[in-house]
Amino acid sequence: MNRIAFITLGCKLNYAETSTYERALLKEGFEAVSWTKGADVFLVNTCTVTEHSDKKSRNIIRKLHRQNPDSLIFVTGCYAQLKKAEIEAIEGVTAVFGATEKSQIVPSILAKVRDQEYCPEGAGRFFPAYSSGERTRSFLKVQDGCDYKCHYCTVPYARGESRNIPIAEIIPQAEAIASEGIKEIVLTGVNTGDFGRTTGETFFDLIKELNKVEGIERYRISSIEPNLLTEEMIDWITSGTKFLPHYHIPLQSGCDTILREMGRRYDTAAFAHKIQYIRERTEVPGGPKVFFGIDVIVGFPGETDELFMETYTFLRDVVRPAFIHIFPYSRRAGTPAAERKDQVQDCKKTLRVQMLEELSAQLHAEFLESNKGVSEQVLFESTDRKGMMEGYTGNYIRISRPFDPAMIGKIVDVII
């Protein structure tokens, strides 16, 4: 019984943690296989950002048991933290691990497979993790948890309070990633920019130290709250560091009324200023444009057609991102927004999602057009898709070329 399959749902942070479990279990003699081909052990890392995420997790667990009735199924992740009893009630589940029990997962799997007893000595406050196995990019977990408690979100309850390990313990992880020949690191967390709560350090301190790691040539920040991305930080990032002109920033709404009711910590004027500040300090005539990926929630309680159009107009005329990541509001038990009586009809949410998807496609096409003829650097990846390989520019434009194994992991100058 040594074949194990990993199923990861949700964010890049989950992928980093799953990769860490995988490395530890491979060292113990396990063989990683595709979950579609059957395995002796399954580890499902769940997501709970929406009700759809919960349902998807349940369906996968049931499917695994139906297709592999004699296999062991272990479940972790945010859904496992919030609804542990609900998952334990699903037929075929061997064990469920919440947010504070991640350090117990590997020893528990080993004990079960080897028919041994395992007595946990206590849960760790922070579970270090980074992804590996790819030759070009790694996701490095630098922070966990969130203290913001926005009115629609259950993630703070699933992930716990904001916490991290010291910079001095993160740098060796980045060095280990570099030793594998990986050139790019994506910094991940639940509220990444809130790094330092438990160590008296700051996210700015962290990125300045990471910038010194030899062998890593590119960094991306997976997501950062606009109020935590300071002008001082932007000035440093744009001064010739290894950090790329690629920003993933949650807006959630382009309407100040809705932002206040969501419990967000900025208004549209502050957000617009931050976007403009980045552009002014990054973009030069004839050079690459900054990639902005923006998160937006549609259909938050109380969002009328007029208030939604404020968001639409703000995105179209002011922010003009390269990509909009759109979420229809999902009613999550235990949050203030779930108790409101002015819920928006699903049909209206669907229409608003469609409108923003069309806008996102238009803005992305314009972003690509604005970068045509520009010189950029591409890090090519190992995937062979029908004789082609792909890579990404610093500002996250996908570039394809005929597959050449010698180009894997190489950073190459191209004209877009």
Language-model segment annotations:
Residues M1-D194, K208, E232, T268-G286, ...:
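Proteins enriched for Cys/Gly/acidic motifs involved in redox and nucleic-acid/cofactor modification
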Residues K37-G38, D147, Q252-G254, D384-K386, ...:
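Short strand-connecting beta-turns/loops that link adjacent beta-strands
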Residues I73-F74, L82, S179-D305:
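Conserved SAM/AdoMet-binding glycine-rich loop
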Residues S103, Y148, G193, N227, ...:
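Glycine-centered loop/turn positions within well-structured domains
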Residues I170, L187, I221, I249, ...:
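Conserved, mostly hydrophobic/aromatic
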Residues E339-I416:
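Terminal RNA-binding accessory module
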